[in-house]
Amino acid sequence: GISKPVQKSAANEIREGRFCKKCGARLEYSFYHYSQLGDYKCPSCGFKRPEIRYDAYDVKVGEQLSFAVEDKHLVANYKGFYNVYNILASYAGLRTAGFSGEHFQDMLNHFNPENGRMEQFRIQGTGVTLNLAKNPAGFNQNISAVMQDKTPKDIIITINDNAQDGTDISWLWDVD
């Protein structure tokens, strides 16, 4: 997880999972990353975010991502704060399975996301980034990634309601 606030803009975002899964009371957040992620507790029954075993700190988001975990400084050529969570989940899985993480940075350097996940390619000499979203949290993070990149850009948003991706696009109304 990430034990300290990183983004300032997330405070006004529509949240998923605002209520305690044990008693139904409204959760209290000391800080919030996006969607339901952050530091929360239930004022009624004491349910709270689990202790963080692998904590990302010194998180920086921009043209690339960087953070530290277990005194390892990791850098990835990805955009979007949500990718800190994705990378951290991969690292935690590796460590939980008993591996050292010694070559984790090398793996990051050679990993190439595909299928619309910050996929980079060129069309007639122009750089294009394709990023798929299938729910409000994902779409909000795509918007955040675009806004964090201060370089001039043209933005095209396309909506797909083909059967393989789901024909119900009503979730778009929940995007901030």
Residue spans of the language-model regions?
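Fold-independent oxyanion-binding glycine-rich loops
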Residues: G1-S3, C23-A25, C45, G93, ...
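A conserved, hydrophobic alpha-helical segment in the catalytic core
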Residues: L37-P50, Y78-N109
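A short glycine/serine-rich beta->alpha loop
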Residues: H73-F81, G127-T129
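Short glycine/proline-enriched coil/turn segments at helix->beta-strand junctions
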Residues: V69-K72, S100, I123-T126, T151-P152
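Gly/charged, well-structured mid-domain segments that form the phosphate/adenylate-handling core
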Residues: F47, K60-G62, G93-A133
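Active-site beta-alpha connecting loops in nucleotide-dependent enzymes
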Residues: A10-R18, G24-L27, E114, L132-D176
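Extended acidic/charged loop-beta regions that coordinate divalent cations
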Residues: G1-H73
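Conserved active-site and cofactor/substrate-binding residues in soluble primary-metabolism enzymes
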Residues: R15-R18, G62, Y82-L88, F99, ...
